[in-house]
Amino acid sequence: MQKLAVYVYIYLFMLISVDPVALDDGSQPTENAEKDGLCNACTWRQNTKSSRIEAIKIQILSKLRLEQAPNISRDVIKQLLPKAPPLQELIDQYDVQRDDSSDGSLEDDDYHATTETIITMPTESDFLVQMEGKPKCCFFKFSSKIQYNKVVKAQLWIYLRQVQKPTTVFVQILRLIKPMKDGTRYTGIRSLKLDIDPGAGFGQSIDVKTVLQNWLKQPESNLGIEIKAFDENGRDLAVTFPGPGEDGLNPFLEVRVTDTPKRSRRDFGLDCDEHSTESRCCRYPLTVDFEAFGWDWIIAPKRYKANYCFGECEFVFLQKYPHTHLVHQANPRGSAGPCCTPTKMSPINMLYFNGKEQIIYGKIPAMVVDRCGCS
């Protein structure tokens, strides 16, 4: 017993006699290790960001059913982009992205993009339709997306040349049909009288929903339309084949479709910034810049907040499924650890040119990370 007491005293004396400098030196590797850990975390986050951006590029093309990015230059876009109210409203009032995480819901989106608005420019017909010896405007080809969705609106937009004095213009929209026995080759869609003030040109929309629905039911009946807009002197003011200085004034169709809303569920997670020292699974900010990719075919948004997930996942931290922890407890060696992944994602609206030089306004699902968690 006395020997044991002696050993205890000697041990305590050695602890008290330890050089304090030695203790300080011993703590230095710990500080260095912490700094190295922070640097490694920054590097890993940067790699995660780069991977996320590349994945986004692939996802956008895939969800839009594009094999590759449309090769449309800025000069071509300037010529094709209609100068009309509906498109300008989409650009000016464009809801780039709502980063509202207060609702805590998760949309069960389909994988592919949901189309909301399609702007179709006139194109060459598969067959030559002539009236009075010359080709007439306009023929429209329709995306397959329109045929499988409910059409809620279809507007034909036309542009009238400017006048020098107050003028009354008589507008006729005619639908071309196969020649009848009496020689008739068209039927009326709409007639209207417009009073135009002098100055800039004038844009006018005409409801063609019924005509479009008939074309979709019977594609062979789509032979095109003719646009007439004469003033009192018989001068045609309709811009059907734009001349010099009339780029973007082509007639076009604005078609809006609707889709069934998706169900949602609740979820929660952590938010961090780039200077955060949080080691747990967290959502970090990430802005995707399409102009930096050279993707001029995307009209809007030019950039959006995509965000990404990064961090460690312990088996008891923010697990998406409760049984994950139970499986690990039952077989800790045979089960992989949970990963930090998105648990809530939301769509973005996008205005873009497709491969056929049509302007599409649609919703691309699961492009914004709203919540991160371990699962």
UniProtKB/Swiss-Prot annotation:
GO terms for molecular function: cytokine activity; growth factor activity. Residues 1-23 form the signal peptide. GO terms for cellular component: extracellular space. Pfam families: TGF_beta, TGFb_propeptide. Glycans are attached at residue 71. Keywords: Cleavage on pair of basic residues, Cytokine, Disulfide bond, Glycoprotein, Growth factor, Secreted, Signal. Disulfide bonds join 272-282, 281-340, 309-372, 313-374. It comes from the Eukaryota. Residues 24-266 form a propeptide. It is found in: Secreted. The keyword Lipid biosynthesis does not apply. SMART domains: TGFB. GO terms for biological process: muscle cell proliferation; negative regulation of myoblast proliferation; negative regulation of satellite cell differentiation; negative regulation of skeletal muscle satellite cell proliferation. PANTHER family: GROWTH_DIFFERENTIATION FACTOR 8, TGF-BETA FAMILY. Homodimer; disulfide-linked. Belongs to the TGF-beta family. Acts specifically as a negative regulator of skeletal muscle growth. This is Growth/differentiation factor 8. It comes from Anser anser anser.
